[in-house]
């Protein structure tokens, strides 16, 4: 399991998780429990909202007394670049192969975690890795960009919210996050332009997902008739159009 933008997720294994607080951070704990209950062997990829390893999480729903943290080289920086995160994720998957004999994985990525997973898949394929990705499932992943990033980078006016209070709150809060990370931070590099431009992330990925079944899931809790499709409907941060990659060619999937 791979968490998304600005998240903290400690490394956990099927029989090893955090003892105090949430088992695996506030982003993926519930889904981890559901997948384990269904009989899956579940590992959470370590992720930190900054460089370095992670031994516990802070903020809402903290986790502590977690399994021994893995090195920074295996830990995704959820405020950094997609490709750096993908490289560290691929290193983590290689570790699972070396340490536990895992040859095949199903990746589940939440939000930006889906982009980290896509980048890791390309890295594994390009290096002829011994690890095979059997499937990819993305949950509200901004395949073609996210409208708060478009607002933060000056490409979308706040009037696109159509005076919807939660939308205005999301955009203003997101812009503060993007400003704190800087123009190369994760919050800015998942804009429509950065992902969909001629030399953007999607173009560079080419056919990396060829032969891999992909399941895309998005949310539509917030909607406004007549609103801009990249924004409405959405689950609050990622529009359904982007989460379902409706404007991407089939070859990209």
Question: Where are the model-predicted features located?
Answer:
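N-terminal non-catalytic accessory region
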Residues: 1-108, 112-157
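Helical cap/lid subdomain of alpha/beta-hydrolase-fold lipid enzymes
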Residues: 122-253
């Amino acid at each position: 399991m791979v968490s998304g933008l600005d998240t903290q997720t400690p490394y956990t294994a099927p029989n090893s998780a955090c003892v105090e607080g949430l088992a695996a951070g506030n982003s993926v704990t519930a889904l981890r429990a559901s997948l384990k209950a269904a009989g899956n062997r579940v590992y959470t990829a370590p992720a930190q909202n900054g460089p370095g390893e992670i031994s516990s999480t802070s903020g809402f729903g903290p986790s502590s007394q977690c399994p021994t943290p893995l090195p920074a080289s295996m830990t995704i920086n959820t405020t950094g670049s997609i490709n750096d995160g993908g490289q560290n994720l691929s290193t983590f998957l290689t570790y699972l192969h070396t340490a536990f004999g895992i040859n095949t994985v199903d990746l589940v990525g939440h939000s930006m975690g889906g982009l980290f997973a896509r980048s890791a898949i390309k890295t594994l394929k390009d290096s002829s890795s011994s690890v095979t990705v059997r499937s990819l499932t993305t949950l509200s992943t901004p395949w073609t960009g996210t409208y708060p990033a478009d607002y933060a980078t000056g490409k979308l006016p706040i009037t696109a919210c159509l005076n919807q209070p939660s939308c205005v709150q999301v955009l203003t809060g997101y812009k503060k996050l993007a400003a704190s990370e800087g123009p190369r931070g994760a919050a800015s590099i998942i804009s429509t332009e950065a992902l969909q431009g001629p030399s953007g992330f999607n173009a560079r990925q080419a056919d990396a997902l060829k032969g891999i079944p992909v399941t895309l899931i998005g949310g539509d809790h917030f909607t406004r008739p007549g609103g801009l499709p990249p924004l409405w409907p959405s689950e609050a941060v990622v529009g359904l159009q982007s989460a379902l990659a409706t404007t991407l060619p089939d070859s990209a999937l």
